[in-house]
């Protein structure tokens, strides 16, 4: 077992790992984010206005909104389940940078889908979500749609860097600092652990 219920009915991590809901959501959301980025990058394989390009952009949006929905569940799991300590304890500045990185990633997973929803709303386009059509957040305003789209694209590039730095930091902690940062979120337990 990766986690156990305490007397208050909340899940608490074993002393050296996050709880299983948090671990599952971390890796599942990574797969979703990879799919979101893949969809938007692969759209260039088809001409503008073509059905395949529109379909892959629709998937980009729907998967992005899925990230938005799941990030709230993930935050709840993290708050209720707690955060196991990093052993050995890193320097205070590393802890601060880690907190800032996590805050930036959560902000990205919340703001980017909302920006996508605003873009489609302002462009006057349908807002699909797996068979549903969501209401627009703002009225039609093509200039606003273009402005938000520029911000969305820039933030998407920043997202690549944030995700890459997050992965690099976890590998640095594991292979250079030899602490349990990576293993706290690993799908597999160390043998004998």
Predicted regions, residues:
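Membrane-embedded alpha-helical bundles that constitute the cytochrome b-like, heme-associated redox core
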Residues: 2-193
């Amino acid at each position: 077992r990766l986690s156990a219920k305490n007397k208050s009915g909340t899940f608490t991590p074993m002393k050296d790992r996050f709880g299983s809901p948090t671990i599952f959501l971390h890796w599942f959301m990574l797969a979703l984010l990879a799919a979101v980025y893949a969809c938007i990058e692969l759209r260039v394989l088809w001409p503008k206005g073509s059905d395949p390009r529109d379909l892959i952009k629709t998937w980009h949006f729907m998967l992005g909104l899925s990230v938005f929905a799941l990030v709230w569940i993930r935050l709840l799991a993290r708050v209720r389940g707690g955060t196991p300590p990093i052993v050995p304890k890193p320097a205070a500045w590393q802890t601060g940078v880690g907190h800032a990185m996590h805050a930036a990633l959560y902000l990205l997973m919340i703001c980017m889908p909302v920006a996508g929803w605003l873009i489609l709303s302002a462009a006057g386009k349908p807002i699909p979500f797996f068979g549903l059509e969501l209401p627009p957040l703002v009225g039609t305003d093509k200039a606003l749609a273009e402005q938000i789209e520029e911000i969305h694209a820039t933030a998407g590039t920043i997202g690549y860097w944030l995700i890459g730095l997050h992965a690099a930091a976890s590998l640095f902690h594991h292979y250079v600092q030899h602490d349990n940062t990576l293993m706290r979120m690993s799908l597999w337990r160390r043998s004998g652990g």
